[in-house]
Amino acid sequence: MAKTNKKKRIRRNVSNGVAHVHATFNNTTVTITDAKGDTLCWASAGTSGFKGSRKSTPFAGQCAAQQAAEKATKFGMRDVEVRVKGPGSGRESAITALQAAGLNVKLIEEVTPIPHNGCRPRKKRRV
């Protein structure tokens, strides 16, 4: 049998990047990109092993951020800018988890989209 040449995947060395924290009411997703915006790694509360309503807890957001930070340090990342989007409960805990994992947080930016009276919002919950 002929040998097939497989290209060896080279892991890029990226020293600084952007951590996008998307915190919804149901889940928290942390995506780490380089300065251009190309995704390096990501993690969410669901991929961290949480199911159902536990995904919306601050601890689940913390675990997702820890997992994403561990993957990012394999790329050689040291400095990170954090962009937070959404009203979820995992926002602050995700930022502190990124700092605790050894990433140097340079900037925290709020990028939650706020409508200037755009679409009609969903109806209020009555519990």
UniProtKB/Swiss-Prot annotation:
InterPro entries: Ribosomal_uS11, Ribosomal_uS11_bac-type, Ribosomal_uS11_CS, Ribosomal_uS11_sf. GO terms for biological process: translation. GO terms for molecular function: rRNA binding; structural constituent of ribosome. GO terms for cellular component: cytosolic small ribosomal subunit. The keyword rRNA-binding applies. Keywords: Ribonucleoprotein, Ribosomal protein, RNA-binding, rRNA-binding. Belongs to the universal ribosomal protein uS11 family. Located on the platform of the 30S subunit, it bridges several disparate RNA helices of the 16S rRNA. Forms part of the Shine-Dalgarno cleft in the 70S ribosome. Part of the 30S ribosomal subunit. Interacts with proteins S7 and S18. Binds to IF-3. This is Small ribosomal subunit protein uS11. It comes from Rhodopirellula baltica (strain DSM 10527 / NCIMB 13988 / SH1).
